[in-house]
Amino acid sequence: MTLAGIFIGGGLGAMLRFWLGNVITAKTKGLSLPIGILTVNILGALGLGIFTGLHVANASVSLIIGTGFFGAFTTFSTFSVETIQLLMAKRVKESILYIVLTLCGSLFAFWCGWTITI
């Protein structure tokens, strides 16, 4: 049952990431950073922070939402690909900014989400 829930939660998270990332990317065309995945990762960290701060006692629910949904909604692999693409295009300043914004923004968003629920 838990594995099926993680599968479903992961599928929903991945579909939402795909949709939202594409919507944001389309609306921010021409900017020098991949804003779609940056936004998705920060929102995902905020959501996971809120969820973690709620201290859900049911282990299955925690796995389905935390590991499944938020694990699939956020994406370190796409962040890595986009960073390397920026570097290969010799856009070093943009790649450094993207790394800093993603890591610091995600950590801060998680902390904010977690803090407001405790």
Curated annotation (Swiss-Prot):
Keywords: Cell membrane, Ion channel, Ion transport, Membrane, Metal-binding, Sodium, Transmembrane, Transmembrane helix, Transport. Pfam families: CRCB. GO terms for molecular function: fluoride channel activity; fluoride transmembrane transporter activity; metal ion binding. The keyword NAD does not apply. It is a multi-pass membrane protein. It catalyses: fluoride(in) = fluoride(out). This is Fluoride-specific ion channel FluC 1. The lineage of its organism: Bacteria, Bacillati, Bacillota, Bacilli, Bacillales. The gene is fluC1.
